[in-house]
């Protein structure tokens, strides 16, 4: 068996590739490529392997789209391919293609304390289910369970469940967005574009015209306290993140913890800490006590997708995580 495997984390814009030490799981030699510069994922992989001159026979790539069979067509990119054909072309013994949040969930057993920031709750209960979700371009969701000394990721498209308002303000937001776009999923309010939707709905609810703002603009104005509407939007985003996380905790009894990934929350960490997130997480009526001790963690590891891709592959090859 070769010492290293190829791991990757591919989104709509960039492909990040690295080497994973098969014995230890350590990630090294990470490099990011612009997906727009290459005709296919296979082409990017060939460039990476040529640059690093390392013998690789196994690989695992996490991709931001549903993986339901051999044919993979990326949601936010033109790349499409057969897993079996790419494996053959590259001469690999193993090639795993997994959902990006499957990879993030598989990273959790590999994370150290310095990779996590806790938001309330007690200690996680060993062996109990885990939930992970995160807002970025969209809203990713996965669960993780431990069965017979193996970690099993339960992927899905939980970001597309219905947005479930639980206050008068949230109900007004739903009404405005539904009139605009029809079905309002959780992702429509818990993502970069979702933050814009919240801002626009807040302004329109007051019979005013919203500015043409980007997520970055809203966050910056909220943190500078220079725009009341932006601050309300960001506050509401945090609250809805809490409600959604609490729903995940209830659904599978995730006493192993609820983990937040994605690139949005770290941009306003102090604001998030002071927000109504945890109160909303526990705002479950008769089941408030049920979720009270469930810890929530923000993942601050630089490359959880690469780490989790490596963990998934190593477990597939027979290693115990």
Curated annotation (Swiss-Prot):
In the Enzyme Commission scheme, what number(s) does this protein have?
2.7.1.2
A GO-annotated cellular component: cytosol
Q: Name one Pfam family in it.
A: Glucokinase
Give a GO biological-process term. Answer: glycolytic process
Q: Where does ATP bind?
A: 8-13
Give the catalytic activity.
D-glucose + ATP = D-glucose 6-phosphate + ADP + H(+)
Transmembrane residues, as ranges? none
The record ties this protein, via HAMAP family, to: Glucokinase
The record ties this protein, via NCBIfam families, to: glk, PRK00292.1-1, PRK00292.1-3, PRK12408.1
Name listed for the protein in its UniProt record? Glucokinase
Q: What is the lineage of its organism?
A: Bacteria, Pseudomonadati, Pseudomonadota, Gammaproteobacteria, Enterobacterales
């Amino acid at each position: 068996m070769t010492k290293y495997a190829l791991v990757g984390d591919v989104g709509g814009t960039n492909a990040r590739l690295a080497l994973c030490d098969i014995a230890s799981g350590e990630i090294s030699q990470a490099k990011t490529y612009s997906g727009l510069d290459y005709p296919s994922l296979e082409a990017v992989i060939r460039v990476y392997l040529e640059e690093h001159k390392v013998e690789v026979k196994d690989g695992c790539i996490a991709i931001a789209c549903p993986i339901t069979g051999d044919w993979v067509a990326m949601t936010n990119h033109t790349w499409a391919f057969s897993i079996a054909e790419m494996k053959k072309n590259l001469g690999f013994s193993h090639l795993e293609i997994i959902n990006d949040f499957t990879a993030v969930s598989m990273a959790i057993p590999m994370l150290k304390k310095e990779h996590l920031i806790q938001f309330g709750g007690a200690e996680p209960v060993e062996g109990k289910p885990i939930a992970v979700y995160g807002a970025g371009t969209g809203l990713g969701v996965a669960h993780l369970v431990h069965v017979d000394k193996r970690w099993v990721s339960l992927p899905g498209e939980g970001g597309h469940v219905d947005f479930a308002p639980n206050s008068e303000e949230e109900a007004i937001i739903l009404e405005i967005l539904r009139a605009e776009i029809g079905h309002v999923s959780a992702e429509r309010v818990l993502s970069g574009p979702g933050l814009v939707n919240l801002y626009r709905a807040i302004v329109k609810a007051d019979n005013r015209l919203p500015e043409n703002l980007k997520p970055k603009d809203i966050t910056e104005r909220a943190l500078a306290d220079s725009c009341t509407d932006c601050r309300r939007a960001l506050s509401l985003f945090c609250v809805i993140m809490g409600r959604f996380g609490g729903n995940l905790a209830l659904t599978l009894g995730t006493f192993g913890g609820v983990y937040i990934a994605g690139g949005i929350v770290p941009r306003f960490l102090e604001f998030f800490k002071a927000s109504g997130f945890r109160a909303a997480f526990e705002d479950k009526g008769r089941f408030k006590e049920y979720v009270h001790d469930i810890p929530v963690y923000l993942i601050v590891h630089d490359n959880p997708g690469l780490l989790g891709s490596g963990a998934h592959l190593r477990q597939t090859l027979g290693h115990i995580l």
